[in-house]
């Protein structure tokens, strides 16, 4: 693998830009015609458990609700797009974004950025895909150009605003997306050929893209043809990788990148052969001889090779690695970096805190992804005795294993394990018809694990029971039931809470059936009701 050093030139950051750069946006502008948020009544059963000052969105296809703690800031309409705006590297979500239809706007859409009080911060005359990097608000083109590429990029499709000063920074006229790293700005530009008519599909789009790296004043520091720049936050398991690293994809022909390079905007170090991020500040890189290196990108200023493997690395916890093993009788390889032990793995699962490894010899281990500590080490059953199996890292040291006997996939054996071994072999609820077809982890709290259990209800509608770790149904007949996914774990619901719909209400519920916050399915601000169909 080639490692090169590239030193970026720097210019003193400009603290003040021309007012003309602010065309189309302003700090604390006059109220827009949208007149948001719409006043709504807070349900009387809103729980004090939500009074934590965190922004959350209760999604509904006909109008989503934005809350800060238990206070309702905004009730949306069906034509709106609502999203949280945050920096994954920070510990708070400070803003939310609303875009809506407006025929008076040249684009047919307007949008605005709001803070945690519901105050309007900035307004725009079109919709954008919005990200936050430190104090920089990045407005990218809403529609992913890669999936349309039938029109030219217009000036203003990609913008960068310093929220500290309210100043808009220079951006290339043909830029459609930007990645911010250490006060440097990597723009991806699309130079559409003039020979193509508007609406004509560009089959060679990636032959016409260009990466431009600029400082705050717009001075170009580096340019690369047939190259795109993206943030590692678009990859999986990026916890712990500094924002110093940006991903550069290079294209020679077609839509698949021919090479991928991680570039460090602070040190100038570049690492070729990027494969994927692996968690805990590491990533996998393919070398020129076909090997794969696990490289630590976070512990020191320069990268450090931790180990080399003959397969691509999928997951990493300190002292433990899981590699892909395509083409053999088993799917994965487990490597103990301390003892050198290697064993075939049938299935594996990870969340942001734990890594569950189910080996073909029947051993099941759960690792802490931060410390590498073994939370659970038990024997389940050899894969040779099963037709197939699934494993989940449930949380709080739990691991869930579903074993499917040969010839009968209708009733798998469901086992829950913790550090002491088997907690319970879960039985199908007696109240559930034989139409059972879905079982998955739901939430954990206070040392207890809960699962959602789907089955066919009346008129073919799917209903859900909530089961505890002992297999007891603590809630029955929910119309919807699933985990809440918010802003990268920054605004998780209070422990144990999840998304649910029961009767004519939908919202956030606890395992004892209490609503933390709920809304009536008839509370939509439009004439058409989504009846709580959450998206």
Language-model segments: residues:
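Bacterial N-terminal signal peptides that target proteins for export
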Residues: 2-13
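Intrinsically disordered, low-complexity regions enriched in serine, threonine, proline
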Residues: 7, 31-32
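N-terminal processing/targeting junctions
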Residues: 14-16, 169
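C-terminal motif of bacterial Sec signal peptides marking the signal peptidase cleavage site
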Residues: 23-24
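Short, conserved catalytic or interaction motifs in soluble domains
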Residues: 27
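Residue-level detector of conserved, function-critical positions
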Residues: 33-535
């Amino acid at each position: 693998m080639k490692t090169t050093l590239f030193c970026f030139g720097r210019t003193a950051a400009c603290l003040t830009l021309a007012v003309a750069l602010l065309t189309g946006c302003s700090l604390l502008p006059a109220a827009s015609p949208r007149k948001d948020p719409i006043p709504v009544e807070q349900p009387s059963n809103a729980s004090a458990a939500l009074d934590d000052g965190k922004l959350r969105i209760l999604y509904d296809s006909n109008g989503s609700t934005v809350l800060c703690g238990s206070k309702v800031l905004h009730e949306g309409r069906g034509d709106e797009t609502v999203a949280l705006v945050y920096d994954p590297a920070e510990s708070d979500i400070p803003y939310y974004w609303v875009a809506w239809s407006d025929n008076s706007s040249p684009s047919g859409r307007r949008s605005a950025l709001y803070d945690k009080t519901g105050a309007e911060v900035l307004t725009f005359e079109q919709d954008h895909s919005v990200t936050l990097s430190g104090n920089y608000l990045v407005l990218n083109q809403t529609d992913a150009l890669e999936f349309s590429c039938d029109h030219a990029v217009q000036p203003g499709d990609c913008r960068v605003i310093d929220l500290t000063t309210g100043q808009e920074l220079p951006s290339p006229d043909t830029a459609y997306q930007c990645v911010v790293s250490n006060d440097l700005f990597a723009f991806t530009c699309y130079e559409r050929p003039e020979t193509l008519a508007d609406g004509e599909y560009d089959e060679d789009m990636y032959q016409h893209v260009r990466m431009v790296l600029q400082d705050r004043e717009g001075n170009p520091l580096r340019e690369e043809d047939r190259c795109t720049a993206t943030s590692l936050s678009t990859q999986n398991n990026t916890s712990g990788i500094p924002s110093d690293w940006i991903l550069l994809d290079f294209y020679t022909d077609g839509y698949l990148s021919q090479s991928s390079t991680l570039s460090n905007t602070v040190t100038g170090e570049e690492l070729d052969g990027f494969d994927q991020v692996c968690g805990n500040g590491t990533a996998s890189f393919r070398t020129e001889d076909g090997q794969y290196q696990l490289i630590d990108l976070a512990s020191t200023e320069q990268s450090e090779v931790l180990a080399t493997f003959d397969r691509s690395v999928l997951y990493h916890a300190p002292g433990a690695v899981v590699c892909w093993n395509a083409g053999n009788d088993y799917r994965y390889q487990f490597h103990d970096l301390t003892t050198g032990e290697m064993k075939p793995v049938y299935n594996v699962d990870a969340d942001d805190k734990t890594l569950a490894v189910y080996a073909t010899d029947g051993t099941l281990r759960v690792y802490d992804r931060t410390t590498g500590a073994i939370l659970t080490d038990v024997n389940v059953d050899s894969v040779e005795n099963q037709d197939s199996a699934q494993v989940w890292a449930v949380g709080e040291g739990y691991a869930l294993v579903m074993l499917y006997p040969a010839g009968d996939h209708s009733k798998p054996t469901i086992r829950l394990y913790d550090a002491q071994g088997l907690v319970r072999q879960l039985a199908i609820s007696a109240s559930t018809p034989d139409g059972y077809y879905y079982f998955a982890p739901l939430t954990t709290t206070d040392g207890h694990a809960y699962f959602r259990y789907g089955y066919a209800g009346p008129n073919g509608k799917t209903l859900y029971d909530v089961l505890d770790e002992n297999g007891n149904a603590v809630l029955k007949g929910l119309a919807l039931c699933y985990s809440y996914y918010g802003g990268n774990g920054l605004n998780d619901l209070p422990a144990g809470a999840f998304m649910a719909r029961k009767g004519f209400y939908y919202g956030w519920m606890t395992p004892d059936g209490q609503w933390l916050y709920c809304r009536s399915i008839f509370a939509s601000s439009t004439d058409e009701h989504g009846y709580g169909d959450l998206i």
